[in-house]
Amino acid sequence: MPIIEQVGAREILDSRGNPTVEVEVALTDGTFARAAVPSGASTGEHEAVELRDGGSRYGGKGVEKAVEAVLDEIAPQVIGLSADDQRLVDQALLDLDGTPDKSRLGANAILGVSLAVSKAAAESAGLPLFRYIGGPNAHILPVPMMNILNGGAHADTGVDVQEFMVAPIGAPSFKEALRWGAEVYHSLKSVLKNQGLATGLGDEGGFAPDVAGTKAALDLISSAIEATGLKLGSDVALALDVAATEFYTEGSGYAFEKETRTAEQMAEFYAGLLDSYPLVSIEDPLSEDDWDGWVSLTAAIGDRIQLVGDDLFVTNPERLEDGIQRGAANALLVKVNQIGTLTETLDAVSLAHNSGYRTMMSHRSGETEDTTIADLAVAVGSGQIKTGAPARSERVAKYNQLLRIEETLGDAARYAGDLAFPRLEAK
């Protein structure tokens, strides 16, 4: 039985140059593992709380308090526990924090320990992380939802939609899907250059041109796909992360594309997009607390497209259960740092799958070189992963880990492809 012997922590930098927490765990059998915690730019109101230092250091974003929480409070509580009992370890973390939103110790401190323990236990068992968490049947490689054009909170432009993604659903393998996505990415750069548009990058590696709006951006990406010789729709589909909470104001509605719109008008806009473009997924099309709007939208177009709750659910089993009962959305975005422990993340995924909801594993805009979510995507069979453009090493690290996993699985590997999107309509 591998016992936790040492727990260490430090402040490191994420991909935006902001501090984050890294945790190291050593077991009595000599096993060692490390995990780094990501952070988001557009964060949901209901997410677990990151502990930041405040003050002038790092503009108030330092995490020395979270590091101290790991070293002074968490370590004494988990040292001596069995690393292979993840639920026991995570419950000890929750009990120690004692708040519903992890605000005392910080979700960044708690998650770092939770993930490092799981990685150490996998190492001790001599298993890849995806196999340790997912068991012998974990074999589905996810469709990479590549954010190749950035807007919203991820870019300083007038584009309101936060992410425009390509999904290589027609590829025969993850390796080929990655190639297709990379070729479309480079093709888009050429399309932008030819039109005199900027090719600077946003937080997640996608281009951030200042284009007229949603349809103009989708047209650019469609042209880039077709320029590679791939078929728009059957080979490579499109997806959006609207992040609508960012432009919603209670009482006045959605300030979208120079108009103030109601939830019903937003729904009409999305229905129009479905008629014109091969979209397979829309994330956060409405605000995180617009439950009535979500229910109406799901009833209107939920049989035609995947509607993903990110800010709506914040990977929280309780909010997800509420949404399932109401009939809001039909898919869950999974971000481990939104909820703060591996166990709660796995519980949310299980609830989603058992309720007929799809799941999409996701990074954050502030990432590190940690590749845990790549293993998690395969472990839980999510069939979809969102980890940015095929550029910037903190994004590519996850894609490269999935290449390794596909190679490890050999003939047992299966690429999810269009089966990840059962609502897909041929266009």
Curated annotation (Swiss-Prot):
Free-text cofactor note: Binds a second Mg(2+) ion via substrate during catalysis.
A Pfam family this chain is assigned to: Enolase_C
Protein's GO biological process: glycolytic process
Lineage: superkingdom: Bacteria
Reaction(s) catalysed by this chain's protein: (2R)-2-phosphoglycerate = phosphoenolpyruvate + H2O
EC number: 4.2.1.11
Keywords annotated in UniProt: Cytoplasm, Glycolysis, Lyase, Magnesium, Metal-binding, Secreted
Requisite cofactors: Mg(2+)
Residues annotated to bind (2R)-2-phosphoglycerate: 162, 335, 364-365, 386
Positions contributing to Mg(2+) binding: 241, 283, 310
Pathway recorded for this protein: Carbohydrate degradation; glycolysis; pyruvate from D-glyceraldehyde 3-phosphate: step 4/5
Residues of the active site: 204, 335
Chief place where the protein resides: cytoplasm
Compartment list: Cytoplasm; Secreted; Cell surface
Family under the similarity heading: Belongs to the enolase family.
NCBIfam families linked to this entry: eno (TIGR01060)
Protein name: Enolase
Organism this protein belongs to: Mycolicibacterium smegmatis (strain ATCC 700084 / mc(2)155) (Mycobacterium smegmatis)
Gene: eno
